[in-house]
């Protein structure tokens, strides 16, 4: 009996509760994406400037979708103060890490979230796969200064992942 085994590749972007909808009609950004890829060979973090309404969020979402198996994202639209809360951001990252490293565990909502076990597993997985794990963060320039230290501590954990690349 010759049965084919179908391997289902996870679209991690589907599990980002803040992932924006992408318009059906798009401007080609291939040259930008090629430039990002080229820059990621040298730099770990890229920060993209852009005025409101120029399509930066759409470009970031498109780039994330291009790497949907190796991408964790968080988009802040600026309208929801709750979306800027470090605990909410950390929870979203936790869920996406769980889908990425296929290690699901029930999380007690009263307990503090610990990303460390996921980060250890992700580091191992990336080392053996030679792929980058992309982190796409949009709208972080809108975060109030009172929350920046808490969010900085989350990002510092992520920066420890060797094959991680960050796009803000």
Indicate where each model-derived feature is located:
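Conserved adenine-nucleotide phosphate-binding loops and their immediately adjacent elements
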Residues: 2-36, 103-106
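Phosphate-binding P-loop
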Residues: 37-46
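P-loop NTPase Walker A phosphate-binding motif
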Residues: 46-76
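Alpha-helical scaffold elements adjacent to nucleotide-binding pockets in ATP/GTP-utilizing enzyme cores
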Residues: 59-63, 88-96, 150-154
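A short hydrophobic beta-strand->loop->alpha-helix junction that borders the nucleotide-binding pocket
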Residues: 73-84, 111
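Conserved NTP-binding/hydrolysis module of P-loop NTPases
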Residues: 84-107, 119-123
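Mid-core helix/loop region of P-loop NTP-binding domains shared across ATPases and GTPases
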Residues: 103-137, 147-165
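Walker B catalytic acidic pair
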Residues: 138-142
């Amino acid at each position: 009996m010759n049965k084919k085994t179908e391997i289902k590749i996870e679209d991690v972007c589907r599990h980002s509760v803040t992932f924006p909808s992408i318009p059906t009609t798009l401007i080609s950004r291939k040259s930008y994406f090629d430039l990002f890829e080229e820059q990621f060979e040298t730099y770990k973090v890229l920060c993209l400037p852009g005025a409101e309404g120029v399509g930066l969020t759409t470009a970031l979402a498109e780039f994330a979708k291009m790497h949907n198996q190796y991408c964790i994202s968080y988009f802040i639209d600026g309208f929801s103060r709750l979306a800027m809360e470090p605990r909410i951001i950390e929870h979203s990252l936790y869920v996406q890490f769980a889908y990425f490293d296929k290690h699901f565990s029930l999380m007690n909502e009263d307990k503090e979230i610990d990303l460390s076990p996921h980060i250890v597993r992700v580091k191992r997985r990336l080392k053996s796969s030679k792929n980058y794990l992309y982190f796409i963060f949009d709208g972080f320039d809108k975060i109030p200064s009172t929350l920046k230290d808490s969010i900085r501590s989350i990002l510092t954990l992520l920066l420890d992942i060797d094959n991680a690349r960050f796009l803000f």
